[in-house]
């Protein structure tokens, strides 16, 4: 299942979550503000050492760095990750 690493204050996280719901893509919402340090460190590492870069996505070990919401780009990235057709 797709993992969405996000924060409640992040508008791009909310837009990504709305997109996933609208497209009926199952996901786990992982609030990085309440996670163990090792999980937060992994998200930071995936994002090149930058702190609080969300939304970050992970699917079967394939990571997508946190980005500003762009529906076209997200659709393409999810296809590349194998999440959707």
Name each model-derived stretch.
Residues 32-51, 78-84:
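Thioredoxin-like thiol-disulfide oxidoreductase module
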Residues 59-85:
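Non-catalytic, surface beta->alpha helical segment in thiol-disulfide oxidoreductase systems
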Residues 5, 31, 66:
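Small/polar loops that bind or transfer phosphate-bearing groups
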Residues 1-27:
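Local sequence-structure signature of Cys/Sec-based thiol-disulfide redox active-site neighborhoods
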Residues 27-29, 63:
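Conserved beta-strand scaffold positions in the cores of enzyme catalytic domains, especially
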Residues 43-68:
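Short, structured active-site "lid" loops
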């Amino acid at each position: 299942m797709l993992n969405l690493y996000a924060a409640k204050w992040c508008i791009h996280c909310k837009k990504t979550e709305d997109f996933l719901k609208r497209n009926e893509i199952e996901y786990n919402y992982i609030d990085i503000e309440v996670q163990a340090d090792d999980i937060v460190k992994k998200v930071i590492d995936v994002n090149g050492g930058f702190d609080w870069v969300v939304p970050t996505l992970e699917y079967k070990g394939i990571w997508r760095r946190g980005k500003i919401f762009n529906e076209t780009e997200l659709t393409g990235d999810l296809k590349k990750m194998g999440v959707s057709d």
